[in-house]
């Protein structure tokens, strides 16, 4: 389980990402836009998880362990980098949930 301090930092990162998204693009203009953006971020998150090929890398590391070979740091680095990309995409998903939760921007012509 991840430590509480780390959880707080992840939440802080999501809030910072939300703030950056609002500063750059404003609030969502409609539930349709909010849904589309959230869907895109979820798809990107899933792509990163699948692209990481974690199982293949873990299998290669396990093969090294079973045959008493030196651990290949490049494999560990690749797992780390892929996990980092996944974490970043997860933060973006969280941020879009927060952004949508803050409401939809009211248009001047709407009541």
Regions found by a protein language model. Give the residues of each.
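Flexible "arm" and connector segments at domain edges
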Residues: 1-111
């Amino acid at each position: 389980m991840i430590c509480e301090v780390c959880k707080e930092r992840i939440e802080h990162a999501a809030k910072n990402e939300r703030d950056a998204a609002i500063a750059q693009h404003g609030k969502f203009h409609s539930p349709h836009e909010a849904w589309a953006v959230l869907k895109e971020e979820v798809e990107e998150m899933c792509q990163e998880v699948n692209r990481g090929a974690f199982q293949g890398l873990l299998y290669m590391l396990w093969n090294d362990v079973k045959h008493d070979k030196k651990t290949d740091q490049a494999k560990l680095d690749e797992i780390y980098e892929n996990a980092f990309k996944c974490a970043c995409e997860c933060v973006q998903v969280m941020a879009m949930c927060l952004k949508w939760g803050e409401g939809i921007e009211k248009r001047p012509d709407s009541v």
